[in-house]
């Protein structure tokens, strides 16, 4: 059934072709016929012979051309009757006939198009009418252009008759070749193998193109309009896609060579019946297939990227202009440059490089953009939680600046309140720096602390209690088991203490790199007198009786060492008063020698006010009150 419908459709189109070609000259005269024989007979057989040598499947083309010449005049007289019959068949077979014939049309169309690899540019002032509005019109366009170059000054009627014969020859050959094609080719491949040259192209003779439709009958005008719409629906999409791609690459020059480059590539694709993916690989257009709304975007881009030349009209105006009819279906090669084989190869490689550069990188760019968006979102998400820590860091920095010059007692630390004012609070023992074994300290409660920092921090936390008030640093190091100090030992303690202080000053005065610069000039002058005195008792483990006798004999040698020791302890603060904390260094150094030091300092504070003045200090060491002088504190 399909074969019968295809045959009827082909016969209907063959009958309608002369009507279309003879739109301007419905009644041929004797003047035009001789010109037709002289102008077209030598050209058509030569081109057909060249095509037959290159393409063996055109064997039936030559006898078809002879038969078409004999039937030319007979069909012209019956144009009105046969055209109405063709319109009816066209309406019935509109859905199936177009797609079934297209592969054969494209094969012959592209094979003949490649038989002439090099053509010259058609002059813009050449007066050629529009070609026939059938799907087979592009198969003879290269021949028509070649003929136009050889005889540009021929009358318009000659080119009409020439196109009439070539159109009929193509129709007969198409009818025979349609039965030889493989019917199993998918419709999708057929649509994609449509030649983009079928779409409407620019024309320099727009005024002449509008005249033939006015002379045709109304029924013929409508039939050709329907035929134009069917062809444009099938073939406009590939042309617009390729045009849009090349507009980004080459501008107006890319528009001139685009349709010819695609025709060269699609000819090889239609001969070998390549799959859809291979055709995309040859054309380098696979990047646009991923676009879902490519029809709308391609039409918009095709209109927006038109050249500004006044002599060139939009390439898709045939699809939008229903009044164009026959004239709107010129091949793209009517007014455009036909490039050479080398130019086509360069265009194809450029298109492939464009696809590899932009078509394949588009997904990567989208992924990179999405990844960049995700990274920005993650950074924002990370920055929001970090805002509060940064504020805390600023507050800490501000508090550090406020507490830099604010001093607190030992065991206390500085902290700012809500208004930024610094104040002292008890230090947490856990915040003390790590301590070594040598940093251990023994308190007056006979408890060993990791360091003095831990001891005073504990004392601060016990403030307000009796234990906290009594807790003091007893000496450095772990607490020892010290026997109780007797009254006799307490009485002997000042004697040993005076001798010990005198011996320390002698060591500091002697030339020693370790003690260099420890004593100032005034101190050295005082120590020098003691050091050079021959009656001085040298250091050693002397009995109490010897120590008591030397003190009475050389009293003046012990006055300055007692003042010097008080000045050394009175540092925090230097107020001429010794606190229990200021006595701690002396206590720690004396404990290994004397276990009565705690009781000794208790005896030195007769008023029990926890403070030892210079006079109280002198009295403990047996210095006379008149010899106690603050001027010796230097």
Curated annotation (Swiss-Prot):
Main location: secreted
Gene: Sparcl1
Tissues in which the protein is found: Expressed in many types of neurons in the brain.
Modified residues (Phosphoserine): 68, 76, 84, 151, 159, 259, 333, 340, 370, 390
Residue ranges of domain EF-hand in the record: 592-627
Family: Belongs to the SPARC family.
Keyword terms, alphabetized: Calcium, Disulfide bond, Extracellular matrix, Glycoprotein, Metal-binding, Phosphoprotein, Secreted, Signal
UniProt organism field: Rattus norvegicus (Rat)
Positions bearing carbohydrate: 144, 368, 446
Name of the protein described by the UniProt record: SPARC-like protein 1
